[in-house]
Amino acid sequence: MARKTLRARRFFSLIFPFFFITSVYAEQTPESAKTVTVEAKNEMFAPQHPDQYQSWKATSEQSAREDALAEDPRLVILWAGYPFSRDYNKPRGHAYAVTDVRETLRTGAPKTAEDGPLPMACWSCKSPDVARLIQQEGEDGYFHGKWARGGPEIVNDLGCADCHNTASDDFAQGKPALTLSRPYAERAMEAIGKPFDKAGRFDQQSMVCGQCHVEYYFDGKNKAVKFPWDEGMKVENMEQYYDAIAFSDWTNSLSKTPMLKAQHPEYETWSAGIHGKNNVTCIDCHMPKVQNAEGKLYTDHKIGNPFDNFAQTCANCHTQDKASLQKVVAERKQAIHDLKIKVEDQLVHAHFEAKAAWDAGATDAEMKPILNDIRHAQWRWDLAIASHGIHMHAPEEGLRMLGSAMDKAADARTKLARLLATKGITHEIPLPDISTKEKAQKAIGLNMQQINAEKQDFLKTVVPQWEDQARKNGLLSQ
């Protein structure tokens, strides 16, 4: 009886603040990104919102770099011919958003504004300067050109104006004033029946995160960001959308498969999981309310692992202790990891077997159904593994996608075995040594010494010029 009473008190202590918040913000009308005057320098808001600013700044403490390719060299083969085969680190704090996109080998080593391998769109989730440029130049103007064009303009790390209408009266009065600062995100939410200006408070909290933590692609000649949600947000829906427009991110250099590269579909996978279905938002788990030294509540902007603030996050809903929940999460993470590796092994073999089939004289017609299976298998695998935290957000959906990927990869290999047999090849296709990142990169023909040297020269010569120009133009604090 005492236990039930305690739970009841706890329930009402949680629910009453929610009713209060709803009433306070019920009359808020979020302003469109098109009407916001964007101030991109985050430190400008420190005097007005000191606790939020200092906690945001503390994301710089999340500085460790984890090399995903070194941890799992199979990825190099799966992404052969694509910049991700050069460099792929696991995510770290928001304070490194601009630094990391400059330093990754994926963005190349451009010498001029018209040089380099990637488009302007690659800045889109890195800085409030993006919203500023879209306001100044329009979307077509912003997306036009190469990534290097944005170097002197996009200089402030992901921050205040990415999620808040910092020019609004509501923000000046200390209210969140949430906004979608990217018009393409606004359109995507409308496509799934969630117009931002009609969404409830809790929906909006996750939608602002869903501007960036999503799957997207670069559309048309201008390489504009678009979310592939026209048919829905499930892996099969997005696959259907991409297939219908014959889109591919690149062609795998081994198998010649037109591939899809998933980005970071946290919004989609969260929506498919128990937290999303019950509207437990990104904010509830990753940005909880905490107290400052004076006992005042504020939203912690040091976005991180919910277990780091267990009492303010998980314990609000769960009765289990921290160790018990950590054990559950670890078991789910391991199950997804184990299936992930099995799928990768199948895909690695499929890419090399497809190469052997081409080398043996296979025709486009013979290879088409096989390449389609490889494309669909790797897409489903990638959407599962690119969603960092799927073991927490939607473990069942993660396992389902990986199981489907395994089936598709097995189909491809069965068809390849039959095709190879018609070419007189009945032995197992040997794999090169891909036991380390370096060996795998050598196996696909990457000259990493040259790539790294070019990048270091870029960082020493070009980036300082970008920063000097930004300071002269008043875009970056001295």
Curated annotation (Swiss-Prot):
Subcellular location: Periplasm
Co-factor(s): Ca(2+); heme c
Gene3D superfamilies: Butyryl-CoA Dehydrogenase, subunit A, domain 3 (1.20.140.10), Flavocytochrome C3, Chain A (1.10.1130.10)
Biological process annotations from GO: anaerobic electron transport chain; nitrate assimilation
List of residues binding heme c 4: 282, 285-286, 393
SUPFAM superfamilies per UniProt: Multiheme cytochromes (SSF48695)
Manner of cofactor binding, per the entry note: Binds 1 Ca(2+) ion per monomer.
Gene Ontology MF term list: calcium ion binding; heme binding; iron ion binding; nitrite reductase (cytochrome, ammonia-forming) activity
Name used for this protein in its record: Cytochrome c-552
Record: residues binding heme c 5: 275, 314, 317-318
EC nos: 1.7.2.2
Broad class of the protein's primary localization: periplasm
